Every structure is written in structure tokens, then in C-alpha cells.
Amino acid sequence: MTSTGPETSETPGATTQRHGFGIDVGGSGIKGGIVDLDTGQLIGDRIKLLTPQPATPLAVAKTIAEVVNGFGWRGPLGVTYPGVVTHGVVRTAANVDKSWIGTNARDTIGAELGGQQVTILNDADAAGLAETRYGAGKNSPGLVVLLTFGTGIGSAVIHNGTLIPNTEFGHLEVGGKEAEERAASSVKEKNDWTYPKWAKQVTRVLIAIENAIWPDLFIAGGGISRKADKWVPLLENRTPVVPAALQNTAGIVGAAMASVADTTH
């Protein structure tokens, strides 16, 4: 049975306004869980499986189905993807197989789940939704920008609670280089930079974004945000910067949020 809305953990398939289901697809792992949409907390444990190699659309879809079926979930679900997605169709592929490009991920994953309704969105966009509803950006009006610092730089823009998808600020040109070539945390590690030296590059990226859209708040995500005290105070841009609060659950939570929004509009 396919639900028309979010479910309860007690009765899979029942409709309520409390619970949703999210899947976070990463280069190394695919994880999912049931989310309490009132609190943004996971209900029970999540399930995490290794991302198949090669990470082709069908192989990933089958792994997603394993996670979903592990919970007995039969309602709509949200799935994050590490790249640009428009109208359910994948446009870029960085950490997954190139055969994703042009694939209707919504239909491919839905077919493996027997026709369950699937909402696909960029992974940073999912994290941005979660952080602005339940995390570091909660109760922050106006324009909020989430930046995830890792191998590259992911981005999400939320305006008064509404997602503006696929911003891809990591590819913004800053001083003749893409932003992520200048300030991804992987660049810091590769060059063995100190936090002060890396913070100068992050500042340049933040100022470039500020000059374009004048945000009210930056949220810094990615593993390096756990050490925000070592570098956020060194930033010299004008907009406040706060570390992400949800960390490893943000993708799952944001995906669950998106699935509910997709079924109620």
C-alpha cells in the first residue's frame, strides 16, 4: 500500500502529520530513517549500507530499497543526491557513476519500491532545509545560506523557510578559481594549511556570496564545522556565521521534510 502522506512508526502506511522518511545518499554510504517532523529527531535507529561500487542508478536504487524495506516503510519518501537534480532528473555526477546524468532518479528509485512516491533533492539543499527548521538556523528570518565544507563546497539557500534549489556556490568563481578549489576543507588538508590561513580563503568565498545576495546568516556544515571554534572567529566577512547543529542527521531529516512538502502541494 502506498500512503498519501507521512506515516507513523507504529503503523507503517497510516497517514499522519508527524512522521516522514528520508534517505541520504553519499559516496561511501546510504543511510535512512524515520523522522519525527515535529522535532526533527530520528525515531529509533537509522540503517546505513555501503554505497555500491560502481554506484550506478540501478545499484543505488536497489540499496535504497533495502534500507526502506528494512523499516517496512510504505509511504512517500525523500532521497538526497550529491549533485544537481531538476524535476527528478539528475544533471551532474561527482561522487557517483557518470551514468546518473540524465537519469530520472525519481522514477528509477520509485520502480524499485513498487511505485512509492519519491522526492529527490540535492544533499546540501536537504541539509539546509533541516538546519533552518530544526537546527542552527531555527527562528532565523530572511535569507540563510548553508555551506558544507568537505571534498568540495555544497550550498543551500533558504528564504523565509522556502528552498531555492541547486545554487552550487562551490562553483562560484572567486579570484580566478572556483570557490571549492580555494576553500574546501580538502584544500586545507592537502596543503597542510593552518586554520588562520584557511579562514582567509573562506572569508573570500563568503564575501563573494555576500556581494551577490546579501544573506542574513551563514551556516557552516561539513566535518570541519565541529571545530568551528578554531576558525569561525577568524572570519572577516560581515554576515554572522554559525556552525551546523544537526551534522550527520541533516540529510535524512531534510529529505523527509521534502517528501512531505512534495505530497502536500
Curated annotation (Swiss-Prot):
GO terms for molecular function: ATP binding; glucokinase activity; polyphosphate-glucose phosphotransferase activity. This is Polyphosphate glucokinase. It is an enzyme of class 2 (transferase). Catalyzes the phosphorylation of glucose using polyphosphate or ATP as the phosphoryl donor. Polyphosphate, rather than ATP, seems to be the major phosphate donor for the enzyme in M.tuberculosis. Homodimer. Belongs to the ROK (NagC/XylR) family. It comes from the Bacteria. Residues 1-22 are annotated as: Disordered. It comes from Mycobacterium tuberculosis (strain CDC 1551 / Oshkosh). Its EC number is 2.7.1.63, 2.7.1.2. ATP binds at D24, V25, G26, G27, S28, G29. It holds the Pfam family ROK.
